[in-house]
């Protein structure tokens, strides 16, 4: 069993909405098969019961536990600690866990992704061709399923430089909605 140090962002927005806070270190005994979300739950249970973290399914189906782990956008429920160990070279230094940087901070690891749902409501359905003899083939139905596999984790928006570095939320819908429009277009 490894004893690993985690550096976790703790903070909240100030009056202007800018995040203020600090990285706080926690040392956790890892069990075999743990994922990052298990670590967060252990920190909540043993050291920081007020650590805010959003999660729901713990199966990579809902996207609620999106965060940045060692600078990479990931689902905490699907990020195995064994993989982190391999990437870091046997846990050299603390494992860094931060909220998604493209979205407004609510508290600690929780961000406000409501913007995405507001944009989604603005997208109108697209109807099929006007031709009454138009046939929807199986290969078209199969292709749509590819686009519908998106779990709305918003990690693609978090990594998009237009959204992350330039904060163009009013001018650009972002990558998530290109996928949404593509699924409607089919």
Where are these regions (language model features)?
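Residues at beta-strand starts and edge strands
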Residues: 2-4, 63, 93
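Local cysteine-cluster metal-coordination motifs and their immediate loop/turn environment
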Residues: 51-83, 145-165
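Ferredoxin-type iron-sulfur electron-transfer modules in oxidoreductases and energy-metabolism complexes
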Residues: 34-46, 95-186
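A positional/architectural concept
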Residues: 21, 27-30, 37-41
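Well-ordered beta-strand positions in beta-sheet-rich domains
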Residues: 23-27, 76, 94, 161
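A generic, well-ordered mixed alpha/beta core segment in the N-terminal half of proteins
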Residues: 66-116
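Eukaryote-biased recognition of intrinsically disordered, low-complexity regulatory segments
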Residues: 1-27
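Intrinsically disordered, low-complexity coil segments
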Residues: 14-21, 82-94, 166-173
């Amino acid at each position: 069993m490894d004893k690993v140090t985690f550096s976790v962002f703790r903070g909240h927005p100030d009056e202007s909405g800018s995040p203020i806070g600090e990285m706080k270190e926690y040392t956790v005994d890892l069990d075999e098969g743990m994922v990052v979300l298990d670590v967060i739950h252990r920190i909540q249970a043993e050291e920081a019961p007020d650590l805010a973290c959003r999660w729901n399914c713990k199966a990579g189906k809902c996207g609620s536990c999106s965060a940045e782990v060692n600078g990479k956008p990931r689902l905490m429920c699907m990020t195995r600690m064994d993989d982190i160990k391999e990437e870091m070279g046997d846990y050299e230094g603390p494992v860094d866990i931060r909220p998604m940087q493209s979205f407004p901070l609510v508290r600690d690891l929780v961000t406000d992704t409501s913007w995405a749902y507001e944009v989604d409501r603005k997208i109108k359905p697209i109807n099929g061709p006007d031709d009454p003899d138009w046939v929807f083939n199986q290969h078209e139905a199969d292709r749509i399923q590819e686009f519908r596999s998106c779990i709305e984790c918003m990690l693609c928006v978090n990594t998009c430089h237009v959204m992350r570095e330039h904060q163009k939320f009013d001018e650009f819908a972002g990558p998530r909605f290109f996928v949404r429009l593509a699924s409607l277009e089919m």
